[in-house]
Amino acid sequence: GSGGMFVQTGDFVNAGGMSANTQMTFYGQEKVEYNAQLCLMNMAVHGLNGRIVSGDEANSFYHDAHNLAGKCDYVMANPPFNVDKVKSESASAAGRLPFGLPGVNAKTKEIGNANYLWISYFYAYLNDHGRAGFVMASSATDSANKDRDIREKLVLTGDVDVMVSVGNNFFYTLSLPCSLWFFDKAKRLENKNRVLFIDARNYYTVVDRTLNEWSEWQLKNLQAIVHLYR
């Protein structure tokens, strides 16, 4: 993408009185070269440095371009939803699958929906105290078969922290609802077997006919709920 999450993270860290460039190292993979250059330019404009890999080696399904499995303090992502025709053998060889592969077509040897590849990657990148937050298709919260098996294993780790259901029209290019997932491998012991679910599908401010958002006070309300839970 264009690095928007990096920029927002940098702004947040800088606003807290720290220097994002000295406190954090930003890594990214972007298959499309143009998008990678746009990301680097966006970061440079905002005074940030990043290591962004592009091209074939940046295909996350088949490469861990930065060799970051088990090393990340934070993971943030907005991956493409419901990607199909992922080569299962290549994906398996690339690793980062602590809970196994999602469903594979026995005839084509392809993964029909890559949502749980992404979810597995984000978890696999975290170190022992790492935290992740990412956007995911709503269908991933109750998909069946191999997805359900992976989801069960993930929940049993105790590291799933918060799930937020989001309504329609929160993206310029996507009208479907989505979910926000948050992992925390350093949860308080009393929360280890708990997950906070927030149904925010009908909680939004209308921007125009095709776009909704959370206002500043709505965001603060959601943050307060999570803070009280934690």
Could you tell me what each predicted segment is?
Residues G1-A77, N82-D84, E89-A93, M136-S139, ...:
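Conserved S-adenosyl-L-methionine
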Residues A69-R230:
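A conserved structural/catalytic subdomain of Rossmann-like adenosyl-cofactor enzymes
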